[in-house]
Amino acid sequence: MSRARAHVVVSGKVQGVYFRSETRDQALALGVTGWIRNRTDGTVEGVFEGDREMVEKLVRWCWQGPPAAEVSNVQVEWQDYTGEFSGFKIAF
């Protein structure tokens, strides 16, 4: 099993639409660890770790987000897996 880490920044109408909580729910269902947070510039940022296939699924999900979201871009930086997370949290 190949492990992966993705640092993502999601742009568009992504705050105030339950993007963070829905991403957490998706991550937990996929067995992906990490965090997600709102940024002051209106984007949402996250770090996802786990099985490469599951991390890729979560990144693809970010392109749609929850029903009220209007995603315009998902920036992804693939990084080395660290295994530093034990769960998935909404960071503040």
From Swiss-Prot:
Documented EC number(s): 3.6.1.7
Keywords: Hydrolase
Domain Acylphosphatase-like: 5-92
One Pfam family of this chain: Acylphosphatase
Catalytic residues in the record: R20, N38
Signal peptide location: none
Key word Transport present: no
Catalytic activity: an acyl phosphate + H2O = a carboxylate + phosphate + H(+)
A GO molecular function held by the record: acylphosphatase activity
Taxonomy, superkingdom: Bacteria
Enzyme type, top EC level: hydrolase
SUPFAM superfamilies: Acylphosphatase/BLUF domain-like
Disulfide bonds: none
PROSITE patterns: ACYLPHOSPHATASE_1, ACYLPHOSPHATASE_3
Cited PANTHER family: ACYLPHOSPHATASE (PTHR47268:SF4)
Similarity comment: family membership: Belongs to the acylphosphatase family.
NCBIfam families: PRK14441.1 (NF011013), PRK14444.1 (NF011016)
Full protein name: Acylphosphatase
